[in-house]
């Protein structure tokens, strides 16, 4: 049983000689891990405002915000609500008009019908004579 213990001790001694080279490798991987963590922390931190307005290739890729905005065309800003012209006119004229006028009651009354008929018969327009009645008279 002593033989396995001696083998373990000898293996430990031999591994201690290689420990300096492995510790350098571990340090290198830790350095890479630190750089990877730094890159990830930069990726997840909030984007800072950038005032660069140029859209050239160099400026589009110089920071993450510019890449998203200029390179990909993604913009997460709030869009302004545009009020339509119809909404403005209906709100301003609504208190002044009656309910039937707002609902679109388009049927004219009898007085309006008579006025329309008389204006059609009398007003023939410029340069026209009353030829329509002479055709039907024959």
UniProtKB/Swiss-Prot annotation:
Compositional bias ranges of the Low complexity kind: 10-23
Which superkingdom does the taxonomy of this entry point to? Viruses
One family from Pfam that matches here is: Tat
Q: Where is this region: Cysteine-rich?
A: 50-66
Print the keywords alphabetically.
Answer: Activator, AIDS, Host nucleus, Host-virus interaction, Phosphoprotein, RNA-binding, Transcription, Transcription regulation
What Gene3D superfamilies does UniProt report for this protein, alphabetically? Tat domain
* Basic residues composition-biased segments: 79-88
Q: Segment Core: which positions? A: 67-77
Q: Which GO terms describe its molecular function?
A: RNA binding; RNA-binding transcription regulator activity
| Modification comment | The phosphorylation by CDK9 does not seem to be important for transactivation function.
Check the record and name the InterPro entries matching this protein: IV_Tat (IPR001831), Tat_dom_sf (IPR036963)
Cellular component aspect of the GO annotation: host cell nucleolus
Instruction: Locate the compositionally biased regions of type Polar residues.
Output: 95-109, 128-138
Q: What is its main location?
A: host cell
> Which GO BP terms, alphabetically?
positive regulation of viral transcription
Region Disordered, annotated ranges: 1-33, 79-138
Q: Which residues are annotated as modified residue Phosphoserine in the UniProt record?
A: 92
- Where does motif Nuclear localization signal, and RNA-binding (TAR) map? 78-88
Briefly, what is this protein's role? Answer: Transcriptional activator that increases RNA Pol II processivity, thereby increasing the level of full-length viral transcripts. Recognizes a hairpin structure at the 5'-LTR of the nascent viral mRNAs referred to as the transactivation responsive RNA element (TAR) and recruits the cyclin T1-CDK9 complex (P-TEFb complex) that will in turn hyperphosphorylate the RNA polymerase II to allow efficient elongation. The CDK9 component of P-TEFb and other Tat-activated kinases hyperphosphorylate the C-terminus of RNA Pol II that becomes stabilized and much more processive.
Q: Subunit arrangement?
A: Interacts with host CCNT1. Associates with the P-TEFb complex composed at least of Tat, P-TEFb (CDK9 and CCNT1), TAR RNA, RNA Pol II. Interacts with CCNT2; the resulting complex is unable to bind to TAR RNA.
Q: What is this protein called?
A: Protein Tat
């Amino acid at each position: 049983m002593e033989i396995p213990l001696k083998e373990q001790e000898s293996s430990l001694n031999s591994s201690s000689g290689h420990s300096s080279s492995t510790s350098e490798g571990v340090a290198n991987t830790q350095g890479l891990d630190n750089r990877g963590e730094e890159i990830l922390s930069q990726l997840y931190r909030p984007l800072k405002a950038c005032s660069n307005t140029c859209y050239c290739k160099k400026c589009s890729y110089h920071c993450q915000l510019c890449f998203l905005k200029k390179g990909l065309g993604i913009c997460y800003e709030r869009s302004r609500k545009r009020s339509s012209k119809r909404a403005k006119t209906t709100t301003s004229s609504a208190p002044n008009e009656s309910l039937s006028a707002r609902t679109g009651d388009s049927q004219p009354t009898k007085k309006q019908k008579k006025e329309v008929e008389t204006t059609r018969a009398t007003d023939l327009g410029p340069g026209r004579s009353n030829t329509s009645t002479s055709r039907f008279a024959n």
